Amino acid sequence: MSSKGSILVVDDEIDITLAFKKGLESNGFFVDIYNDPIAALLNFKSDFYDLLLVDVRMPKMNGFELYQEIEKIDKKTKVCFITAFEVYYHALREIFPTLEVGCFIRKPIEIDDLVKRINAEIHSLDIDK
């Protein structure tokens, strides 16, 4: 694949996924988008995506639950959670004690800033996985 990387974007807001797809593809990334976390899980391709961009609050399955299910399929896939809300790490640890994630992106975000965060995550070393 000649792209900068492959990204799976999952957000229940169609305008967000379309804007991310357009902006990321124009910056050289391959992008798949889903507005339904269940459909994203059912169509997930192991060893294909370099990074998941997953909204925290979605109907049917929240972003943390989706990532936990995807991690059962592919432990190497990195994730950045996207949210319009403040993230409270202490409360998050109580609900998902095994979740090891350090990348949270606040919406709205400019595409240039998103690209920088994605590049940093894709190229970061992940010793545990």
What are these regions (language model features)?
Residues 14-32, 99:
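Two-component/phosphorelay signaling modules centered on CheY-like receiver
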